[in-house]
C-alpha cells in the first residue's frame, strides 16, 4: 500500500508536522529523507529494510560512498544530499557554541563533539580553543591514528594554543570501539598536557572521550 493511502495521522510527513520530529521512528525519519520507495515497497518499508541491512541508523549515516550506494534505493545523489544535511547539522552546533560561553551551554559542547568525532573510523585527537570568557575560538584536529602518550606531542598542542591566543582548552578524542572509558594512557596524556599548558597559564577545562553513548568527561570523574 502506498503511503498516500495510509490514514493521514500515520503518514510520516504529516506526523512530523503535527507531533514534531522527535515523535517519529528512525524508519519514518529516513522515509521522509528518501521521499519515495521502490517498486512494490513504500518509503517506510524500504527504510525499515535499509536500517536492518545497515544494522541501524548510525551505521547508515556513517557509511562511505561505496557502502551507501550498494543498497537498493540509494545512490550518489542521495549520498550527496545526506552529507549536506549532516554538515548543516554540524555547522548549526558550531554556531551554538560560538554564541555563548561554553559554561552556559555544556550540552552544546557534548553535542558538537559527538557530531564531529563519533563517525571517525580511527582515533582522532582535537582541541576546542577558548578565549578568556570561555567562548570558542576554534576547533582543530591535531593528531590522528593511535592516540597515546607517544603520538600526541604537548609541544604541538602548546604551539597551536599560542597561535590561537587561547586562554583555556577542552581536549577531546574518540574511541572507535564505542567504549568511552578512559585508559591509563588517556589519563596520563591528560596530565601531561595539563602540566605543559599550565606553563603558559592556560587551563585545561575538560577532556571528553567520544564513544557510543554520551561523551565521557574526565573532569566529572575527578581525573583532571
Curated annotation (Swiss-Prot):
Q: Which UniProt keywords apply?
A: Hydrolase, Metal-binding, Metalloprotease, Protease, Zinc
Family matches, as InterPro entries:
MPN, RadC_JAB, RuvA_2-like, UPF0758, UPF0758_CS, UPF0758_N
- In its keyword annotation, does this UniProt entry include Metal-binding? yes
Q: Which GO terms describe its biological process?
A: proteolysis
Describe the location of the MPN domain by residue ranges. Answer: 102-224
Name the Pfam families for this protein. RadC, UPF0758_N
Per UniProt, where does Zn(2+) bind?
173, 175, 186
Which is an annotated GO molecular function term of this record?
Answer: metal ion binding
Where do we find the motif JAMM motif here?
173-186
- Family per UniProt? Belongs to the UPF0758 family.
* Protein name per the record: UPF0758 protein PA5319
Amino acid at each position: 500500500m502506498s503511503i498516500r493511502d495510509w490514514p493521514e495521522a500515520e503518514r510520516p510527513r504529516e506526523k512530523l508536522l503535527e507531533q514534531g520530529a522527535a515523535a517519529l521512528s528512525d524508519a519514518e525519519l529516513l522515509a521522509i529523507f528518501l521521499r519515495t520507495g521502490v517498486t512494490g515497497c513504500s518509503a517506510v518499508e524500504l527504510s525499515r529494510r535499509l536500517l536492518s541491512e545497515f544494522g541501524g541508523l548510525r551505521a547508515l549515516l556513517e557509511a562511505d560512498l561505496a557502502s551507501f550506494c550498494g543498497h537498493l534505493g540509494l545512490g550518489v545523489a542521495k549520498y550527496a544530499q545526506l552529507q549536506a544535511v549532516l554538515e548543516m547539522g554540524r555547522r548549526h552546533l558550531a554556531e551554538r557554541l560560538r554564541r555563548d560561553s561554553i559554561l552556559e551551554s555544556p550540552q552544546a559542547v557534548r553535542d558538537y563533539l559527538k557530531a564531529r568525532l563519533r563517525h571517525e573510523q580511527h582515533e582522532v585527537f582535537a582541541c576546542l580553543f577558548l578565549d578568556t570568557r570561555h567562548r570558542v575560538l576554534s576547533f582543530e584536529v591535531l593528531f590522528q591514528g593511535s592516540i597515546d602518550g607517544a603520538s600526541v606531542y604537548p609541544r604541538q598542542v602548546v604551539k597551536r594554543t599560542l597561535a590561537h591566543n587561547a586562554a583555556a582548552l577542552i581536549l577531546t578524542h574518540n574511541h572507535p570501539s564505542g567504549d568511552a572509558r578512559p585508559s591509563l594512557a588517556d589519563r596520563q596524556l591528560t596530565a601531561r598536557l595539563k602540566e605543559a599548558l599550565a606553563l603558559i597559564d592556560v587551563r585545561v577545562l575538560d577532556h571528553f572521550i567520544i564513544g557510543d553513548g554520551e561523551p565521557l568527561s574526565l573532569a566529572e570523574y575527578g581525573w583532571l
